[in-house]
């Protein structure tokens, strides 16, 4: 792998070697838009010293996943954008960065506050006193760990760097300490061991199934974990009568009735795709397709554009930096499902949302906001990378 340095020595340049990939003419519009969006994401929000985008920890794992997905689709453009260098810099620097986290929940929406690095001044704040910090992409929240594990799995797929896959394996080892809840095999959200939520369990299943296909010496172990977890998840009641995934389970291990966030409808699709690919069983695709169709029906507006479950995009909070990431997670995983179980509905939904983002949710500098319907709201790193997920997904489906 070829390395040099740019950005004053902060960002390593790494060329990703692979065979030349054909370019689909009709998809080129989305390639050009994704190229502009990735360039803007990295120029405006990336901190090379910490390896993080916009000081947002778990969101940065999603931004990295988006870059990795673009790389698998368009290698030449990825090399022009130095995506391999951003991967390597994030791998080297983010795992050494002191990150301490506070998460609160208000009416079902989680809000994360991060203190990045001890010398930033935030450690003097009372809220952060006594909070734990971890190295190697681990922290107090198992869902955060799951996002990073998936990011390194996708980075491994794109770059072929064994260190990335090894990191995902290491992260999952810590995630396994989340087991032991009162809700059968369900895992806890955090190391406080109080809440069994959907997203952590979806990520747990998805990471296990993904590793089963990539770590041959432990494939049967990971696959057994993933299969048992889906058996539990599908029967736990967390999927409601409308085939939508609620936020989590209550203290009696019953569906808590909280919001059906878009990302909870998305991650499970990716997990079921990985289970299908690992087993060859179409049963998993049937379940995934049912959830995907229910989510589109419930969360799309009259124009077919994805809107968060509580219409938070144009509220005073604009969904917060956590919620701003959600819709991209759904579209990304819908694309994964479409690749193995294609549906005209899925393709048209992805294209329609990518087009609306570019037309209605972009400013003159190619920043992408949270309201995919428009009007444009000042973008953040999370809103921008989330919208990029839709544009990258459009590349994949435009000419299938």
Residue ranges and their predicted role:
Residues 162-233:
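Aromatic- and glycine-enriched pocket-lining scaffold segments that form the walls
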Residues 22-143, 158, 196, 283, ...:
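CBM-like carbohydrate-recognition segments
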Residues 65, 150, 170, 206, ...:
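Residue-level signature of alpha-solenoid helical repeat scaffolds
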Residues 60, 145-148, 165, 201, ...:
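Residue-level detector of extended alpha-helical repeat arrays and alpha-solenoid scaffolds
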């Amino acid at each position: 792998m070829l390395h040099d340095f740019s950005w004053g020595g902060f960002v390593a340049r790494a060329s990703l070697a692979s065979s030349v990939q054909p370019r689909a003419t009709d998809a080129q519009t989305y390639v050009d838009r994704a190229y502009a969006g990735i360039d803007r994401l990295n120029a405006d929000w990336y901190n090379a010293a910490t390896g993080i985008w916009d000081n947002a920890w778990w969101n940065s794992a999603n931004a990295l996943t988006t870059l990795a997905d673009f790389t698998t689709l368009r290698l030449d453009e990825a090399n022009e954008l130095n995506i391999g260098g951003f991967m390597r810099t994030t791998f080297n620097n983010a795992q050494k960065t002191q990150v301490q986290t506070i998460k609160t929940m208000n009416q079902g929406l989680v809000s994360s506050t991060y203190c990045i690095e001890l010398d930033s001044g935030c450690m003097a704040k009372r809220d952060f006193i006594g909070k734990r910090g971890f190295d190697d992409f681990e922290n107090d929240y198992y869902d955060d760990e799951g996002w990073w594990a998936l990011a390194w799995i996708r980075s491994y797929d794109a770059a072929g760097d064994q260190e990335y896959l090894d990191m995902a394996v290491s992260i999952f080892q810590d995630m396994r300490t989340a087991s032991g809840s009162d809700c059968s095999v369900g895992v806890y959200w955090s190391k406080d061991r109080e809440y069994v939520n959907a997203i952590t369990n979806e990520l747990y299943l998805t990471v296990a199934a993904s590793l089963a296909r990539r770590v041959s010496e432990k494939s049967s172990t990971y696959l057994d974990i993933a299969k048992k977890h889906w058996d539990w998840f599908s029967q736990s009641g967390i999927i409601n009568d409308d085939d939508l995934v609620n936020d989590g389970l209550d203290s009696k291990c019953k569906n808590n009735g909280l919001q059906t966030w878009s990302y909870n409808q998305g991650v499970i699709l990716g997990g079921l795709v990985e289970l299908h690919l690992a087993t060859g069983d179409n049963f998993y695709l049937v379940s995934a397709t049912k959830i995907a169709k229910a989510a589109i029906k419930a969360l799309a507006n009259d124009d077919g554009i994805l809107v968060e479950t509580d219409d938070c995009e144009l509220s005073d909070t604009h969904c917060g930096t956590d919620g701003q990431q959600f819709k991209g997670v759904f579209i990304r995983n819908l694309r994964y499902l479409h690749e193995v179980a294609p549906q005209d509905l899925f393709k048209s939904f992805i294209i329609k949302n990518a087009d609306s983002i570019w037309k209605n949710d972009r400013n003159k500098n190619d920043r992408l906001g949270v309201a995919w319907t428009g009007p444009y709201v000042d973008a953040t790193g999370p809103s921008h990378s989330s919208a990029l997920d839709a544009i990258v997904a459009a590349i994949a489906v435009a000419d299938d």
